[in-house]
Amino acid sequence: MYLKCLYICNDFRNENQKTIKEEIFMVSRADLKQELMDAGIRPSVQRLAIFEYVRQSCQHPTAEVVYEALREELGSLSLTTVYNTLKLFVDAGLISMLTIDDTFRCFDGNRSCHAHFRCNNCGKIIDLKMKKDFISLVEGGEGYKITDAQLYLKGLCPNCIKK
């Protein structure tokens, strides 16, 4: 399977230099199964399907979207199972839960260092590449062991600006 994601890449040294490119990740079902086992998670059919869906999605799905996408394929899948499984994956560090505001929670299977931009008009969430050493830009962080950082940006996407 191939995973195609659209990224808006920003070079933070030159704010005017912006490019859009498509990146392709090759992830096999066997690799995903091994990731679950490495995290100490038994790879049941439902867990593997949910993990595969979130890791393949570039749309930052909600639990409801994951459920709707997989319920026919898996038959006995419940929304509660999806919520519990996603929480299990988040707790294991396999995916991230995005809480850009108090009313919206979605999930991200892209574990590379990136920020999230949410358009205030259309609601679309876009991954923005960033340098891995962006933590060094934070003052007063010496002596801390940072295990996670999430950067959320809000504004208008290029499509909404054109309208």
Regions found by a protein language model. Name each.
Residues 1-27:
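Short, intrinsically disordered or compositionally biased N-terminal tails of bacterial proteins
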Residues 27-40:
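Short, Lys/Arg-enriched N-terminal segment that forms or immediately precedes the first helix
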Residues 82-92:
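Basic amphipathic alpha-helical segments that dock to polyanions
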Residues 91-163:
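Non-DNA-binding regulatory cores of transcription-related proteins
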Residues 48-53, 65:
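Pre-recognition alpha-helix immediately N-terminal to the DNA-recognition helix
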Residues 43-45, 56-62:
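Short capping segments at the starts of secondary-structure elements
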Residues 65-71, 82:
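A short acidic, leucine-rich amphipathic alpha-helix
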Residues 62, 78-79:
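Short coil turns linking two alpha-helices in DNA-binding domains
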